[in-house]
């Protein structure tokens, strides 16, 4: 049986393809939009059986081309640029496309795992998979929220096959280089340090000290493991937060990135205070454009994920960033 991965050349999608390969699974249809041609690099070291453009795939799927051949669709393909304000494009790409795949999977009794987002919570301070805590602030978040609402209703009515949505928090790790400004802070810090010998962070604002704004940073390694756990457990459906379950300040990311780079340079680790004193960590004024629109704190409540049976420990920023820097240096030299 064949597994479909949409967004397969993207960040999380390509890591999922690699994770499936590591299990010996290569009968994979990779679906994506390679208008950004550089994304193909993410699949060069992966094994797939076929590639299709996302529009061609949906057309063939609904025409019955793959009837009886698919075991699962891992749907990671979407417009993830939170600054894209084209509502029609966002809803067509993120909501309608997801709905079409979901309906097909229910009809054909195929497992369906898809990417939701922590953007569904908006400026909330409680990050728990419950309606009262949700309030997206942009059309990207709304497109994800709306399909989550559809799934909730369909679960009440009764599903014919597994359907799982993952609310990804701040994911970082290998194969994100094509994302440009939307890539993780760890990726940008790595490049800043390698090019300039220092990294830049937002200074304090709204009661937060320099670099102390915090996020739930989750390694893509853990994201892949959780996806595969649910693939192995087709009886579990629902919407789940996928973060580390801990909030860590941007200072931690800077410190971890710099020290991982220094390790490769044969230099001793430094404390954050030493980095600041030596000018390696530099704080810039908090941008006026972000004031009032910026989340200074996120932390996934992963109790529901644990209740579903996923018991593995999540990587800390220090652990995950260290491994990520090893990978980046291995690729870039």
Curated annotation (Swiss-Prot):
Keyword annotations of the record: Carbohydrate metabolism, Isomerase, NADP
Binding-site residues, substrate: 170, 181, 188, 202-205, 215, 294
Cofactor note: Binds 1 NADP(+) per subunit.
Enzyme Commission number(s) from the entry: 5.1.3.20
Cofactors demanded by this protein: NADP(+)
Coiled-coil region: none
Source organism superkingdom: Bacteria
Annotated function: Catalyzes the interconversion between ADP-D-glycero-beta-D-manno-heptose and ADP-L-glycero-beta-D-manno-heptose via an epimerization at carbon 6 of the heptose.
Subunit structure: Homopentamer.
Protein name: ADP-L-glycero-D-manno-heptose-6-epimerase
Species of the source: Chromobacterium violaceum (strain ATCC 12472 / DSM 30191 / JCM 1249 / CCUG 213 / NBRC 12614 / NCIMB 9131 / NCTC 9757 / MK)
């Amino acid at each position: 049986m064949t597994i479909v991965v949409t967004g397969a050349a993207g960040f999380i999608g390509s890591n999922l393809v690699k994770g499936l390969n590591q299990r010996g699974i290569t009968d994979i249809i990779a679906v994506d939009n390679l208008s950004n041609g550089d994304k193909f690099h993410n699949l060069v070291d992966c094994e797939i059986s076929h590639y299709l453009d996302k529009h061609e795939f949906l057309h063939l799927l609904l025409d019955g081309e793959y009837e009886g051949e698919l075991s699962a669709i891992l749907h990671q393909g979407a417009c993830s640029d939170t600054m894209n304000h084209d509502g029609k494009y966002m809803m067509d790409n993120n909501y309608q496309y997801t709905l079409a795949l979901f309906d097909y999977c229910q009809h054909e009794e195929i497992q369906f795992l898809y990417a939701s987002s922590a953007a569904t919570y908006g400026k909330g301070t409680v990050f728990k998979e419950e309606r009262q805590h949700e309030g997206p602030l942009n059309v990207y978040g709304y497109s994800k929220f709306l399909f989550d609402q559809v799934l909730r209703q369909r679960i009440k009515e009764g599903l014919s096959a597994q359907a799982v949505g993952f609310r990804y928090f701040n994911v970082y790790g290998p194969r994100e280089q094509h994302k440009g400004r939307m890539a993780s802070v760890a990726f940008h810090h790595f490049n800043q340090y390698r090019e300039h010998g220092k990294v830049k962070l937002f200074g304090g604002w709204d009661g937060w000290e320099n670099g102390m704004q915090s996020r739930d940073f989750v390694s893509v390694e853990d994201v892949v493991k959780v996806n595969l756990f649910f693939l192995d457990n087709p009886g579990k459906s629902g919407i789940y937060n996928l973060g580390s379950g801990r909030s860590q300040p941007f200072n931690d990311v800077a410190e971890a990135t710099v020290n991982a780079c220094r390790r490769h340079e044969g230099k001793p680790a430094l404390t954050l205070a030493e980095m600041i004193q030596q000018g390696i960590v530099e704080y810039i004024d908090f941008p006026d454009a972000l004031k009032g629109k910026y989340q200074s704190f996120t932390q996934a409540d992963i109790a529901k994920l644990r209740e579903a049976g996923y018991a593995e420990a999540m990587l800390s920023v220090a652990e995950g960033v260290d491994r990520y820097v090893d990978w980046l240096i291995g690729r870039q030299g």
